[in-house]
């Protein structure tokens, strides 16, 4: 919604220490960096069987995730690096085969990531070497700027929710590896939330769901050290109206506001 320059400035000035989004946020931000716009007529394209089947978005984002998972990156970091570096290095099949043989006994997870990458390289007949992918509008990309500034940018996708799942380059194992790293990175930031602010904008499900798990994990660690996270400030911004005064506690179950997850979950998280 054209606020990327604002968030980039906030990162540059040190006001934002972590950014998180869902899979769609990753896609739109990448498309702006790649081509300067992001839109699609869903109503027209679904009947034609063309919704979300854009080659560039599906191919490049999925490839960045497969490569990033192999490199030990999270979801957002993998895409941010791909944009900022304007491409990626495709390893040779022989190099990956050798890595698999060397690591399968001692690091089977890395061997599996290498095997995933090898499979996609063979499937799409990718030549080894540098694959240049210009991103002429990357100055507007949140992911690339976060990567450049060293600010964690995490993605918390749901399988099948996003258009990249319609492309043959999509690989669930790579997405799972990258997304799990991002969840743990998000939880690590929540661990440092004491005296901080959590701003949730327009996320009715993803934000409250990952936050409550992350806060619980963080409280567990703090309690073991004789501490507790209590002095945090949560701001929920959403266009959907709530007619309940949450300062009174939760509404009864027969009140529709009870089912506004983005209010109910955060109301249970303590702080202010």
Question: Which sequence ranges carry the predicted segments?
Answer:
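Active-site cofactor/substrate anionic-group-binding motifs, chiefly glycine-
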Residues: 1-27
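General beta-strand structural signal in soluble alpha/beta enzymes
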Residues: 18-22, 28, 154-157, 199-200, ...
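Short gly/pro/ser/thr-enriched loop/turn and capping motifs at secondary-structure boundaries
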Residues: 25-29, 161-164, 207, 241-243
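Ligand-binding beta-strand-loop-alpha-helix segment within the catalytic cores
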Residues: 28, 40-149, 155
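C-terminal functional extensions of proteins
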Residues: 176, 185-189, 195-197, 204-272
């Amino acid at each position: 919604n054209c606020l990327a320059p604002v968030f980039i400035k906030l990162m540059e000035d040190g006001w934002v220490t972590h950014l998180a989004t869902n899979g769609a946020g990753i896609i739109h931000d990448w498309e702006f960096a790649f081509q300067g716009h992001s839109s699609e007529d869903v109503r027209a394209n679904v009947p034609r069987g063309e919704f979300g089947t854009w080659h560039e978005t599906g191919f490049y984002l999925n490839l960045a995730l497969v490569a990033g998972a192999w490199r030990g990156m999270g979801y957002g970091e993998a895409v941010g690096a791909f944009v900022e570096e304007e491409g990626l290095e495709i390893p040779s099949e022989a190099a990956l085969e050798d890595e698999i043989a060397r690591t399968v006994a001692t690091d089977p997870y890395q061997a599996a990531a290498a095997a995933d990458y090898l499979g996609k390289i063979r499937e799409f007949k990718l030549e080894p070497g540098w694959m240049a992918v210009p991103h002429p509008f990357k100055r507007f990309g949140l992911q690339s700027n976060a990567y450049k500034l060293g600010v964690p940018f995490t993605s918390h996708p749901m399988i099948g929710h996003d258009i990249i799942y319609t492309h043959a380059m999509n690989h669930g194992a790579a997405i799972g590896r990258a997304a799990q790293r991002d969840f743990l990175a998000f939880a690590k930031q929540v661990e440092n939330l004491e005296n901080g602010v959590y701003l949730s904008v327009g996320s009715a499900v993803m934000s409250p769901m990952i936050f409550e798990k992350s806060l619980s994990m963080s409280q567990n660690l703090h309690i073991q050290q004789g501490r507790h996270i209590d002095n945090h400030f949560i701001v929920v911004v959403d266009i959907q109206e709530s007619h309940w005064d949450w300062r009174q506690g939760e509404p009864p179950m027969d009140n529709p506001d009870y089912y506004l997850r983005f209010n109910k979950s955060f109301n249970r998280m303590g702080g202010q």
